[in-house]
Amino acid sequence: MAKSPANNAAQRVRKKVRKNVSDGIAHVHASFNNTIITITDRQGNALSWASSGGQGFKGSRKSTPFAAQVASEVAGRAAIEQGIKNLDVEIKGPGPGRESSVRALGALGIRITSISDVTPVPHNGCRPQKRRRI
């Protein structure tokens, strides 16, 4: 006789841990295809995150400023539930969601203390890929 699927381990639901953190860092990774926002505390532990693709935007709509704004609002609301009031914003990448994601976080009522660009720039490191010819 087979075991029933109602197993104790399968039914165990993990309760969401509420941290009470007032200051944090918003890491915005804006690529040409997607925008990912991760909000962490000062030590780097993730409190909330969201991406344009995770909000239902697919294909070329993922890379729009509006999709980045929606993702920032989702991540920001989850961070406010954790107690975030002040954020430093670190933007990485050249994508179209750079500015709109920062504006969306500010519109939620989170105080943005600093905005810094941490896009990695090579000091003439690896050879780039060949040019596209269309």
Curated annotation (Swiss-Prot):
SUPFAM superfamilies linked to this entry: Translational machinery components
Keywords tagged on the record: Ribonucleoprotein, Ribosomal protein, RNA-binding, rRNA-binding
Subunit structure: Part of the 30S ribosomal subunit. Interacts with proteins S7 and S18. Binds to IF-3.
PANTHER family tied to this protein: 40S RIBOSOMAL PROTEIN S14/30S RIBOSOMAL PROTEIN S11
Gene expressing this chain: rpsK
A Pfam match: Ribosomal_S11
An annotated GO BP: translation
InterPro entries: Ribosomal_uS11, Ribosomal_uS11_bac-type, Ribosomal_uS11_CS, Ribosomal_uS11_sf
Protein name as it appears in the record: Small ribosomal subunit protein uS11
